[in-house]
Amino acid sequence: NMTVFRLNRDCTFPHPKHAESDGLLAVGGDLSAKRLINGYRDGIFPWYSEGDPILWWYTHPRFVIYPDRFTAGKRLMRYWKKTSYTFTIDQAFSQVIGLCGSSRTGRGEETWILPEMREAYGQLHELGYAHSVECWDVDRLVGGLYGVELGGVFFGESMFSTVSNSSKFCLIYLVEQARKRGVQLIDCQMTTRHLLQFGAVEISGEKFYQHLQLLIADIGPQPAWKI
């Protein structure tokens, strides 16, 4: 029984419990900051290909990392402690999102990070909701990730690396910062096998929704990520 909701001008969404088994919940609307934030509050995110209408998803079960249960293998942690790379936050957001898109097309994969998505998340970044982590080899950007932070939740969107381990290092760095900032949940959206090594777990759509109601209270603009 397939019901996909068509969104109208007001920025509300149907309840995530109406999502299809593949996660599809709604179609249409726009990528305004208000609509995106309303979506993320309930764990709903846009994901679509060029030429498609905007598709909104609530994937379930949900793949998440609890920062206080994060693990990384001994060998990786050894590399992490010895790395000469430097890490920053919010220093090159538009470069990071651009490279997340182009690294996929470079591998012959389709990218959902279309120009209008880059623009929309760039606006969320300017408003203090979207953040990037950068990995630098001196002054060359060699890895990064970006996502949206609301209250105690970081919604990971995408990552890229041009050298081995750099995106994994960005994840370790993100978790360290998340712990300092009181972020209690990192949403990985899809079940991605390589995240299992970091202690990522699958939880039900209901449990994820309950987490969000608890961790995202009335959101004002997020405080800046200070290092």
From Swiss-Prot:
Subcellular location: Cytoplasm
Origin: domain of life: Bacteria
GO MF annotation, one: leucyl-tRNA--protein transferase activity
InterPro entries: Acyl_CoA_acyltransferase, Leu/Phe-tRNA_Trfase, Leu/Phe-tRNA_Trfase_C, Leu/Phe-tRNA_Trfase_N
GO terms of biological process kind: protein catabolic process
Pfam family name, one: Leu_Phe_trans
Reactions the enzyme catalyzes: N-terminal L-lysyl-[protein] + L-leucyl-tRNA(Leu) = N-terminal L-leucyl-L-lysyl-[protein] + tRNA(Leu) + H(+); N-terminal L-arginyl-[protein] + L-leucyl-tRNA(Leu) = N-terminal L-leucyl-L-arginyl-[protein] + tRNA(Leu) + H(+); L-phenylalanyl-tRNA(Phe) + an N-terminal L-alpha-aminoacyl-[protein] = an N-terminal L-phenylalanyl-L-alpha-aminoacyl-[protein] + tRNA(Phe)
EC number: 2.3.2.6
UniProt keyword list: Acyltransferase, Cytoplasm, Transferase
Any one GO cellular component localisation term in the record: cytoplasm
Protein family membership: Belongs to the L/F-transferase family.
Stated role: Functions in the N-end rule pathway of protein degradation where it conjugates Leu, Phe and, less efficiently, Met from aminoacyl-tRNAs to the N-termini of proteins containing an N-terminal arginine or lysine.
NCBIfam families in the cross-refs: aat
Protein name listed in UniProt: Leucyl/phenylalanyl-tRNA--protein transferase
The species this protein was found in: Desulfotalea psychrophila (strain LSv54 / DSM 12343)
Gene for this chain: aat
